[in-house]
Amino acid sequence: MPVAKKYFEIRWHGRAGQGAKSASQMLAEAALEAGKYVQAFPEYGAERTGAPMRAFNRIGDEYIRVRSAVENPDVVVVIDETLLSPAIVEGLSEDGILLVNTVKDFEFVRKKTGFNGKICVVDATDIALQEIKRGIPNTPMLGALVRVTGIVPLEAIEKRIEKMFGKKFPQEVIDANKRALRRGYEEVKCSE
């Protein structure tokens, strides 16, 4: 008899330089501050900006013993729509969520991946360009993820942005990232 999973798993797909690793780390730190047990780690080969990469999260109420890559995620986050393929949704059950950074509709994503479960889309790149003035869509994607999962409160991510960016960047950069986070949260749309 299979043992019930005691933690929530997320697999991020993006390209190096798009912030998947940073987003998974920020999510983990926010969950840790909320009293959860967490894991966040990237997986990549010889990295160059633009090379495909993955990052992973596990978040739970109990100690997480497993140390392998996420094989059966509850959510797959795709930061770069050019990576969409059936391989992206490998291990994602029909009860899971596929969250994609795209301007395209649910049917486009469904055709590219063959996934018949819940699909959520948000134009995170445009949000990032408008708010942060850089085409790095990880912050709006994190806002969208928080909205569709409720894994941590949005305010917990805002606090992490303040802590992570507070000593390195001026207040206007922090505020721009918080706006991008909120817009991702507000603008994500889901099928079903």
From Swiss-Prot:
Naturally occurring in which organism (per UniProt): Thermotoga maritima (strain ATCC 43589 / DSM 3109 / JCM 10099 / NBRC 100826 / MSB8)
Subunit annotation: Heterotetramer of one alpha, one beta, one delta and one gamma chain.
NCBIfam families given in the database record: PorC_KorC, PorC_Meth_Thtga
Catalytic activity entry: 2 oxidized [2Fe-2S]-[ferredoxin] + pyruvate + CoA = 2 reduced [2Fe-2S]-[ferredoxin] + acetyl-CoA + CO2 + H(+)
Protein name, entry field: Pyruvate synthase subunit PorC
GO molecular function term, any single one: pyruvate synthase activity
Region forming the signal peptide: none
The UniProt record lists the keyword Oxidoreductase: yes
EC number: 1.2.7.1
Key words, A-Z: Oxidoreductase
InterPro entries: Oxidoreductase_gamma_subunit (IPR051626), PorC_KorC (IPR011894), Pyruvate_synthase_PorC (IPR053412), Pyrv/ketoisovalerate_OxRed_cat (IPR019752), Pyrv_flavodox_OxRed_cen (IPR002869)
Disulfide cysteine pairs (residue numbers): none
Gene that this polypeptide is encoded by: porC
Pfam families: POR
